[in-house]
């Protein structure tokens, strides 16, 4: 069974480190549990479960999670060239619109909420660790494992903070709550923070068992996989002021390769047979899932259960059977990026060509233009295009499912939703809800991280090519989307090939890897962070913005500023709670 991420309200009332709507820095003990209870297995498990529960939102699974989505659709995709904000126009969730056009400041509420809730999550881990450290193995069963699990979770929360905000305060369970406001956010730089987090993951991996009795509980290979991710980020050495990538740390890259090999050698992971299985609940804890946030439905908590509230603003709107708010829409550039050449390989010159599948709506009829070029089949696994079959829904194809088509176009996101006729979808509000897990790390990541490390090392490029081709082969053998009116035909001219050995230089391999990461991981909350890690955010985003201005006037003032926009500003509220100790990230206005 899944590890349960739910807690009774009475326990929430006595947590010694609760969170309110002000700041994690302002917390005071709200109650206490006896030492006898807290140093028992049952008492410790309550604190451990609270730290796990924070993966889905530390205040529980409610609508408030929309303001700090754990899926990072706002912070990692709308901020990139992959997606538009969507919804009911630029004024609808204007704070996210500001992220999209690079016009954020330290007063942005979505940033303050994200910071606050991630630190609440860190605080839960510290609370559990403090109790676990003070107890003995005789008092608490599985004590060593629980300590390691909490360190992995804490490192996960800190990693999110680091890649979002750069300048962050770091404290562990040995720091008292009342001392939190006295810790500066520039005591450790990015490299030092990532070193700490990678070490925590490695130390935890030495203790954790290879398997756990409950699905969702952290084990050895989750820690190793996450260590690989952190070390891959750290390998790209950044200038502290400009955020430019100045060098590559080859020792760290070799460690990434070794860690990925250990995960693969475990024999427990593989790619799912069909890409579309990633969005089916039957496969959510299958062979591709390495680390996932576990969700549940109709479990007796909240209105629908511990569902993924992070994405519930994003269910298709308009006339769709989901009746949703229609946020988070795929960009035209992402659609175009799926075009392939005559060999089924990515068309690296797609931006110099007409838009693929651009739509016109006349009355109630859509016309899709320029649909003769070949495309990667993952396009229609990821994007809901007008007139194209939507999953297994038989009543009609994707149609007018976007709320503000004049601003954002006609395409919607197909990932992360179960088909509307499925019994796995919740009936009624919240719209489109299901208990589909959120994949933090999946096996495709392991393959692509290893390939990236090998390419940057300039070593064993052939193996890197084979790893990329593994991912492409899975897409090639997946069941293609069929024409809605004639299921004997494919919905598009799908063509995907494998990279040959000829011409596979380091430069070409790097471009191929980065394109593959985009196509395979589209809309999974990682794109913007990838661009920053690779040191290509300024060029990529300003080229994208220049093209978008032609069709979307709200991009008129948008501009990515190097040395600033790689990271979000430290929130103003948090500066106040630190008694003025925090320093702001480069390029942003001083705190007020």
Regions found by a protein language model. Give the residues of each.
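Short coil/turn linking the two alpha-helices of tandem helical-hairpin repeats
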Residues: 162-169, 212, 230-242, 456-458
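Conserved, well-structured interaction surfaces
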Residues: 40-41, 45-49, 53-59, 64, ...
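An aromatic- and glycine-enriched ligand-binding surface/loop that stacks and positions planar moieties
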Residues: 20-92, 202-203, 217-224, 229-403, ...
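Long, intrinsically disordered, low-complexity segments
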Residues: 19-20, 76, 118-121, 192, ...
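Bacterial N-terminal signal peptides that target proteins for export
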Residues: 1-7
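Bacterial Sec-dependent N-terminal signal peptides
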Residues: 3, 16-39, 155, 197, ...
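Bacterial N-terminal signal peptides
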Residues: 8-16
């Amino acid at each position: 069974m899944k590890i349960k991420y739910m807690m009774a309200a009475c326990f929430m009332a006595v947590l010694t480190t609760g969170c309110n709507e002000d700041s994690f820095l302002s917390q005071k003990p709200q109650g206490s549990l006896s030492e006898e209870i807290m140093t028992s297995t049952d008492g410790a498990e309550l604190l451990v479960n609270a730290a796990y529960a924070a993966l889905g939102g530390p205040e529980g699974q409610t609508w408030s999670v929309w303001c700090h989505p754990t899926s990072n659709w706002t912070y990692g995709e709308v901020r990139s060239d992959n997606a538009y904000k969507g919804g009911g126009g630029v004024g609808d969730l204007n704070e996210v619109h500001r992220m999209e056009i690079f016009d954020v400041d330290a007063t942005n509420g979505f940033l303050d909420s994200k910071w606050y809730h991630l630190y609440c999550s860190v605080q839960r881990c510290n609370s559990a660790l403090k109790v676990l450290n003070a107890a003995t193995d005789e008092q608490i069963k599985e004590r060593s494992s629980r300590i390691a699990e909490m360190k992995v979770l804490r490192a996960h929360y800190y990693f999110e903070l680091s890649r979002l905000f750069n300048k962050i305060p770091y404290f562990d369970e040995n720091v008292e709550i009342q001392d939190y406001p006295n810790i500066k956010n520039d005591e450790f730089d990015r490299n030092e923070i990532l070193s700490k987090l990678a070490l925590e993951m490695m130390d935890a991996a030495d203790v954790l068992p290879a398997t756990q009795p409950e699905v969702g509980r952290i084990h050895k290979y989750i820690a190793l996989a996450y260590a690989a991710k952190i070390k891959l980020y750290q390998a790209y050495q950044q200038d502290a002021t400009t955020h430019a990538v100045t060098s590559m740390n080859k020792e760290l890259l070799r460690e990434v390769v070794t860690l990925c090999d250990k995960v693969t050698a475990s024999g427990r992971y593989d790619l799912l047979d069909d890409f579309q299985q990633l969005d089916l609940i039957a496969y959510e804890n299958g062979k591709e899932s390495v680390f996932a946030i576990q969700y549940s439905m109709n479990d007796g908590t909240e209105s629908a259960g511990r569902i993924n509230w992070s994405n519930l603003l994003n269910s298709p709107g308009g006339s769709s059977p989901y009746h949703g708010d229609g946020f988070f829409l795929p960009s035209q550039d992402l659609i175009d990026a799926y075009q392939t050449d005559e060999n089924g390989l990515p068309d690296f010159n797609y931006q110099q060509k007409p838009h693929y599948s651009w739509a016109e709506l006349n009355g109630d009829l859509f016309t899709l233009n320029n649909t003769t070029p070949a495309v990667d089949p993952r396009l229609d696994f990821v994007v809901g295009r007008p007139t194209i079959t939507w999953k297994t829904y038989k009543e009609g194809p994707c149609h007018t499912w976007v709320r503000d088509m004049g601003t954002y176009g006609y395409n919607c996101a197909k990932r992360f939703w179960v088909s509307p006729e499925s019994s796995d979808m919740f009936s009624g509000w919240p719209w489109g809800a299901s208990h589909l897990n959120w994949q933090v790390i999946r096996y495709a990541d392991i393959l692509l991280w290893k390939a990236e490390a090998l390419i940057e090392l300039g070593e064993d490029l052939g193996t890197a090519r084979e790893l990329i081709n593994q991912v492409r082969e899975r897409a090639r053998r997946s069941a293609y989307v069929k024409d809605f009116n004639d299921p004997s035909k494919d919905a598009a001219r799908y063509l995907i090939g494998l990279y040959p050995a000829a011409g596979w230089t380091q430069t070409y391999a790097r471009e191929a890897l980065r394109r593959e990461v985009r196509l395979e991981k589209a809309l999974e909350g990682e794109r913007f962070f990838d661009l920053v890690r690779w040191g290509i955010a300024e060029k990529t985003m300003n080229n994208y913005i220049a093209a978008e201005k032609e069709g979307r006037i709200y991009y008129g003032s948008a501009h990515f500023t190097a040395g600033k926009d790689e990271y979000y500003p430290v929130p103003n509220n948090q500066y106040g709670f630190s008694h003025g100790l925090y320093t702001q990230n480069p390029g942003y206005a001083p705190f007020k």
